[in-house]
UniProtKB/Swiss-Prot annotation:
InterPro entries: Dehydroquinate_synthase (IPR050071), DHQ_synth_AroB (IPR016037), DHQ_synth_fam (IPR030963), DHQS/DOIS_N (IPR030960), DHQS_C (IPR056179)
Gene: aroB
Protein's name in the database: 3-dehydroquinate synthase
Keywords: Amino-acid biosynthesis, Aromatic amino acid biosynthesis, Cobalt, Cytoplasm, Lyase, Metal-binding, NAD, Nucleotide-binding, Zinc
Residues reported to bind NAD(+): T126, T127, K139, K148
Main localization (coarse): cytoplasm
UniProt xrefs under CDD domains: DHQS
EC assignment: 4.2.3.4
Length: 357
């Protein structure tokens, strides 16, 4: 049972990767817990709710359904659920279990962060992307029309319970979207993981348990280490944004309806690699290898009709923009990235145009 400690000033907790761990959920509820509220979506509960329902047998709990889709990741649904919690008798002894993909873990965590100034949350991610990224590290929030995750809070969970078995029924498109986040981990910090993804592509795409468990565990370990060293994105944690600055602009431009988050990140990594090469940070040889890896786990959906000019305008609204300067995470070599600001707009524009081609 791989278990990785996430150590932050707010809380120390475990991110556990184990098949069947959902069945042990009751062990992670604090003593004297009041009402338990499971934040999920109707679709997740219908297709993947059985393990958690069985695990909570004998424990009274309430289901709170969020609307599905990145375009619904807004403040209004969170407010509606908070009102519903009050009507159902929630108080400061209550807790939230966020059970779903990255949208649910973000919104469920945010609900827990702001309800009565903060109640506990247990994260149980049910998509690959949420398991290796979104559920770990305490980032919670919702989108604005202007950009992604512009309203949010850091709220560390009691634990993160990652059960690879829950992915057996995950749609192929969702699975591949999560794989791109794992590729990100390989590019920014984990050379051995990058090599494994290259050598074991067939096993990974076939979802062979040994391969899936390995890539999840390695990604969770990396994320736990980075968050433990830098909870609030002061320095080290910025490397996790590789592909996200460009990707968030693409998501906003498409009104959060056209792409899954992992697909936008895959395109964003392409743009960052092109920018890294044009600015001299990464060699052409490493650039080719990274781009090929992204392509091998593709395809990225068609981006026909997207204009680089519009994406450039979106970049200034990214939450990583400081004093008008956009910060880019660019590759140096496989396993290493750097944070750069002050890059001239024409270079950024050309990188995005190349990535759109």
């Amino acid at each position: 049972m791989p278990s990785y400690l996430v150590e932050t000033p707010q809380r120390c907790y475990s991110a556990i990767v184990e098949r069947g761990i959902i069945g042990q959920t009751a062990q992670y509820l604090p003593p004297k817990t009041g009402k338990v509220f499971v934040v999920t979506t109707a679709d997740v509960w219908k297709h993947a709710g059985a393990p958690l329902k069985a695990a909570l047998a004998g424990i009274p709990f309430e289901i709170l359904n969020l609307p599905g889709g990145e375009d619904q990741k807004r403040l209004a649904p969170v407010e509606a659920l908070a009102e519903e919690m009050v009507q159902r008798g929630a108080d400061r002894s209550s807790m939230v279990i966020a059970y779903g993909g990255g949208i649910v873990t973000d919104m469920g965590g945010f609900l827990a962060a702001i309800f009565m100034r903060g109640i506990p949350v247990l994260q149980i991610p049910t998509t690959l992307l949420a398991q290796v990224d979104a559920a770990i590290g305490g980032k919670t929030g919702v989108n604005l029309v202007s950009g992604k995750n512009l309203i949010g809070s850091f709220h560390q969970p009691l634990a993160v319970l990652t059960d690879p078995a829950i992915l057996d029924s995950l749609p192929e498109r969702e699975y591949r979207a999560g794989l791109w986040e794992i590729i990100k981990a390989g590019i920014i910090r984990e050379v051995e993981l990058f090599d494994y993804l290259s050598e074991s592509r067939a096993d990974v795409l076939a979802r062979k348990p040994e391969a899936v468990d390995h890539i999840i565990a390695e990604s969770v370990r990396m994320k736990a280490e980075v968050v433990s060293s830098d909870e609030r994105e002061g320095d080290m944690r910025r490397i996790l944004n590789f592909g996200h600055t460009f990707g968030h602009a693409l998501e906003a431009e498409t009104e959060y309806k056209r792409l899954l988050h992992g697909e936008a990140v895959a395109w964003g990594m392409r743009a960052a690699i092109y920018l890294g090469e044009s600015t001299g940070y990464v060699s052409a040889e490493d650039s080719v290898d990274m781009l090929q890896m992204i392509e091998d786990y593709g395809p990225i959906p068609s981006l026909a009709g997207i204009r680089a000019e519009n994406l450039l305008a979106r970049l200034v609204h990214d939450k990583k923009t400081v004093q008008g300067k956009v910060h880019f995470v660019l590759p140096v070599r496989i396993g290493e990235v750097t944070v750069v600001s002050g890059i001239e707009e024409p270079l950024v524009f050309e990188a995005m145009r190349s990535a759109l081609a």
